[in-house]
């Protein structure tokens, strides 16, 4: 075959695979086969000097540009007017209603009833892509002033989900948002000398970086939502425009809603606000736009904004505030971690007074100092995180000093990697109390009525220094504890006695093996079936267990090497603790070996019971939808997982359909 023809075929094939993987989330080729074809293309291009402008090899160059050139947009990129209350949305809606009524009263060609299209308002950097009459990407530009932006074509090409060639023979400008996902952000920050402060800065800084190789390191993504300019037949509705964007292979978010009433809009605002922190990218609101294009054209624009759209803005996810102090706390493992004490600040509707700082390396890398103004970010975490400092606020600030002794017991601290530990396991109150509370917890030994206050008293007054000491407690001594009468003392002893008969997975979880949670404990028990087998397990055997990686495997091996660990386990067994494992016979079913996600409220099952049912049928129950998901069982008020499953073409079952299958 002619080498130029072969290059053209390889380019077409590789671009198809990229679309499947980065846009559809479902690849039809293995990574190995893709790499083989990619490097075949690289070699052919070197040999012949023939390179197509839309070849995947042109995505990343080792180039540093001298400057950004200006680009004049064919159609202006408008800002949107903003609302922060439903009342402001109502006022905007009423203006639209009034316009529509007046127009239809005086015009022969009536406008259709108002219908709004709702999409997420992404918190990234707006980009405008231009495609020529052959469908080839020729320019990528920032929004800039709205009329003139900066040419960032080389940077835009590093975004792998953006098509370099599309099936369209009209000159086209399409608008979207370049974003950084939380995964890309965390990976970049784990390796970077200077960590990024937030996802938006990560995206904006990447596209406005003259070093294209640095842009590529940030692994940006993008969503597209608007055709700014298109030669040829115009669109009649926004939904028609969105369908066009999708059919041309551009990455789109799966959330698009049609609303006709304010009540419907309110429900969608509430829904997106609820799932906002579950997303793996930042949004700062919702865009509400009129669907009918003719109505849009007649409504027109103000000097700044289109009259036919408005953005509903959520509360900020990030804020700046003053770092007042650092508090050092001891965890169950003995790790001593810093917590920032902040000047109270409102963040995403919550008053934030504390934030995590991770460790001294993290503090040094981010340049955090006492008295400085710091950037605080709230995501899925219960406690927000400090991302960096405001450079202008550093004058007069103080260095954060690392403690040399344990803040709880005064023992000397030791370094292990980036963390510091207190090794006074038996005499350090926070360590022992948290260990006992974990051991007694519902998903561990399930000792009813046990509390942290009880654990504190057992440590302070009854000299409990190990979990096995719980099984040596005496009735008379319990009566010496605060608020412990005869009934409460006996109830606690009965609950401790009852806990002796436990499942092996609960016992394993109760031991507090580092990095071993409830699910991992269950998976380990299924694989090894006895404590003795697990104690003898090799590294290779451990990593063969589903979801057990190198770190977890090493944690388990190190845990069972400890002489004290084995002593405690043997003592627990000698005191009558009887962990047992009953091998459940898994019935043949359509769910055998399948990955299943449950979303919404089911009529006949709690979350625990449906999980147990699915596992008894041989299924793996997952908490998130991906291209590896086989089924989604959807109940009432199914949320974003349902939407994602639909967009990926995953089989969605109602509760009734699920029961019919089994």
Swiss-Prot record:
Entry function: DNA ligase that catalyzes the formation of phosphodiester linkages between 5'-phosphoryl and 3'-hydroxyl groups in double-stranded DNA using NAD as a coenzyme and as the energy source for the reaction. It is essential for DNA replication and repair of damaged DNA.
Catalytic activity: NAD(+) + (deoxyribonucleotide)n-3'-hydroxyl + 5'-phospho-(deoxyribonucleotide)m = (deoxyribonucleotide)n+m + AMP + beta-nicotinamide D-nucleotide
Record's keyword terms, sorted: DNA damage, DNA repair, DNA replication, Ligase, Magnesium, Manganese, Metal-binding, NAD, Zinc
HAMAP family named in the record: DNA_ligase_A
Molecular function per GO: DNA binding; DNA ligase (NAD+) activity; metal ion binding
Active site: 121
EC number per UniProt: 6.5.1.2
Gene3D superfamilies, alphabetized: 5' to 3' exonuclease, C-terminal subdomain, BRCT domain, DNA ligase/mRNA capping enzyme, Helix hairpin bin, Nucleic acid-binding proteins
Protein residues bound to NAD(+): 31-35, 79-80, 143, 177, 313
Needed cofactors: Mg(2+); Mn(2+)
Family stated for the protein in its record: Belongs to the NAD-dependent DNA ligase family. LigA subfamily.
Regions that span the bilayer: none
UniProt record, GO biological process: DNA repair; DNA replication
Chain residues that bind Zn(2+): 406, 409, 422, 428
A family per Pfam: DNA_ligase_aden
Protein name in the entry: DNA ligase
Domain of life where this protein originates: Bacteria
One Gene Ontology term, aspect cellular component: cytosol
Every BRCT domain range: 586-662
Uppermost EC category: ligase
């Amino acid at each position: 075959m002619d080498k130029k023809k072969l290059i053209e075929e390889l380019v077409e094939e590789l671009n198809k695979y990229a679309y499947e993987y980065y846009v559809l989330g479902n690849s039809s080729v293995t990574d190995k086969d893709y790499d083989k074809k990619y490097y075949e293309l690289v070699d052919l291009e070197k040999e012949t000097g023939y390179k197509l402008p839309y070849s995947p090899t042109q995505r990343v160059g080792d180039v540093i540009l001298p400057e950004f050139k200006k680009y004049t947009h064919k159609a202006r990129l408008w800002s949107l007017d903003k609302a922060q209350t439903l009342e402001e949305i109502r006022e905007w809606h009423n203006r639209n209603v009034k316009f529509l009524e007046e127009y239809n009263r005086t015009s022969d060609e009536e406008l259709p009833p108002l219908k709004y299209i709702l999409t997420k308002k992404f918190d990234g950097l707006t980009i405008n892509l231009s495609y020529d009459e052959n469908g080839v990407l020729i320019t990528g530009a920032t929004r800039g002033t709205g009329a003139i932006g900066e040419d960032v074509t080389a940077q835009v090409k590093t975004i792998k989900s953006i098509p370099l060639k599309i099936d369209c023979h009209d000159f086209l400008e399409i608008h979207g948002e370049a974003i950084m996902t939380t995964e890309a952000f965390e990976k970049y920050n784990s390796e970077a000398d200077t960590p990024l402060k937030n996802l938006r800065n990560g995206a904006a800084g990447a596209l406005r970086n003259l070093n294209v190789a640095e842009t590529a390191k940030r692994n940006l993504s993008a969503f597209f939502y608007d055709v700014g300019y298109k030669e040829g037949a115009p669109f009649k509705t926004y939904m028609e425009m969105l369908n066009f964007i999708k059919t041309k292979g551009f990455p789109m978010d799966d959330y698009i809603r049609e609303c006709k009433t304010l009540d419907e809009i309110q429900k969608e605002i509430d829904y997106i606000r609820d799932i906002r922190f579950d997303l793996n990218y930042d949004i700062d609101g919702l865009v509400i736009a009129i669907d009918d294009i003719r109505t849009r054209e007649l409504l027109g624009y103000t000097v700044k904004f289109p009259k036919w759209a408005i953005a509903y803005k959520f509360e900020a996810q990030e804020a700046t505030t003053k770092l007042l102090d650092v508090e050092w706390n001891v965890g169950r493992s003995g790790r001593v971690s810093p917590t920032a004490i902040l000047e109270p600040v409102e963040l995403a509707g919550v008053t934030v007074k504390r934030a995590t700082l991770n460790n001294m390396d993290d503090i040094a890398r981010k340049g955090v100092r006492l008295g400085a103004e710091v950037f605080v970010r709230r995501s899925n975490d219960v406690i927000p995180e400090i991302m960096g400092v405001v450079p202008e606020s550093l004058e007069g600030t103080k260095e954060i000093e690392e403690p040399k002794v344990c803040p709880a017991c005064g023992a000397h601290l030791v370094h292990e990697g980036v963390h510091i530990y207190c090794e006074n396991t038996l005499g350090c109150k926070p360590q022992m109390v948290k260990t006992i509370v974990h051991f007694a917890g519902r998903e561990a030994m399930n000792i009813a009525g046990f509390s942290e206050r009880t654990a504190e008293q057992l440590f302070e007054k009854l000299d409990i220094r190990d979990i096995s000491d719980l099984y040596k407690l005496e009735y008379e001594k319990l009566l010496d504890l605060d608020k412990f009468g005869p009934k409460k003392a006996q109830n606690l002893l009965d609950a401790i006695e009852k806990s002796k008969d436990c499942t092996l997975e609960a016992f394993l979880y109760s031991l507090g093996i580092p990095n071993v949670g409830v699910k991992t404990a269950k998976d380990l028990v299924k694989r090894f079936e006895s404590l003795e087998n697990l104690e003898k397990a090799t590294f290779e055997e451990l990593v063969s267990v589903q979801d057990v990686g190198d770190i977890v495997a090493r944690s388990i091996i190190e845990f069972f090497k400890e002489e004290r660990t084995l002593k405690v386990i043997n003592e627990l067994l000698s005191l009558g603790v009887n962990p047992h494992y009953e091998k459940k016979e898994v019935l043949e079913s359509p769910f055998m070996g399948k990955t299943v996600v449950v979303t919404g409220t089911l009529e006949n099952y709690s979350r625990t019971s449906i999980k147990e049912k699915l596992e008894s049928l041989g299924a793996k129950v997952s908490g998130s939808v991906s291209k590896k998901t086989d089924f989604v069982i959807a109940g009432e008020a199914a949320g974003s997982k349902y939407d994602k499953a639909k967009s990926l073409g995953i089989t969605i079952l109602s509760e009734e359909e699920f029961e019919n299958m089994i």
